[in-house]
Amino acid sequence: MEKGTVKWFNNAKGFGFICPEGGGEDIFAHYSTIQMDGYRTLKAGQSVQFDVHQGPKGNHASVIVPVEVEAAVA
């Protein structure tokens, strides 16, 4: 799986884009591919892991898994 950061996500339209960690073109993200319980959404700046496949208009993310960021212990 690749890693990246959510660039933006529109809840009303159900899609957004992910910036891949290694650079390159932004990757299309659809709510139906987000792997989580309840309301499936992403937030700008959120870290995610995902698989990439070629769609008709560019790269699409599939199996999007939000990455939990552990809080630093002082």
Curated annotation (Swiss-Prot):
Top-rank taxon: Bacteria
GO cellular component: cytosol
Domain CSD: 4-64
Keywords noted in UniProt: Cytoplasm, DNA replication inhibitor, DNA-binding, RNA-binding, Toxin
Gene deletion effect: Deletion represses the production of persister cells.
Coiled coil location: none
Assembly with partners or alone: Homodimer.
Function noted in UniProt: Inhibits DNA replication at both initiation and elongation steps, most probably by binding to the opened, single-stranded regions at replication forks. Plays a regulatory role in chromosomal replication in nutrient-depleted cells.
Entry-linked PANTHER family: COLD SHOCK DOMAIN CONTAINING PROTEINS
UniProt name for this protein: Cold shock-like protein CspD
Species of provenance: Escherichia coli (strain K12)
Phylogenetic lineage: Bacteria, Pseudomonadati, Pseudomonadota, Gammaproteobacteria, Enterobacterales
